[in-house]
Amino acid sequence: MKKKISLLTISIFDNILSSRISNIDKRGPTMAREKFSTLTEQMFYILLCLREEGCGMDVMTRVNELTGGRVAVGPGTLYNLLEQFLAAGYIVETRAEGRRRSYQLTAEGKTLLQNEVERLQAQVRDYEKLFER
């Protein structure tokens, strides 16, 4: 038996999600930086693809092409993360034409990516110590 989801349920969920997203700014840059100390695969590729200026559609296309479809970023996830990256100072909005906005990685965003690469390389070294004997 399928359960029906009411508009009220969706509205309540939307309000909870919106309040959590808006709290990002209220917690300040320190909390945002802590949140991004370890990146998810989607976060990593979104930032990587913003090395060059691009809008949301550009980013989704670049991630798909770069990973051969292995990593998918949906619009909801993408725009949520873009807002968080903007608030944390990892990307900057470069253009706005109607509803279409373009973004680019900042120096702080490049540092975040480099730190993530170093973290991943350390994991590979640890793996090799144990399994490549």
Predicted regions and their residues:
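Short, intrinsically disordered or compositionally biased N-terminal tails of bacterial proteins
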Residues: 1-34
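Basic, amphipathic "hinge/linker" alpha-helix immediately C-terminal to the N-terminal HTH DNA-binding motif
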Residues: 98-117
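Short, hydrophobic-biased segments on the C-terminal half of alpha helices
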Residues: 79-84
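Beta-hairpin "wing" of winged helix-turn-helix
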Residues: 86-98, 104
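N-terminal helix-turn-helix DNA-binding core of bacterial DNA-binding proteins
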Residues: 33-77
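Amphipathic alpha-helical dimerization/coiled-coil segments
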Residues: 20, 114-133
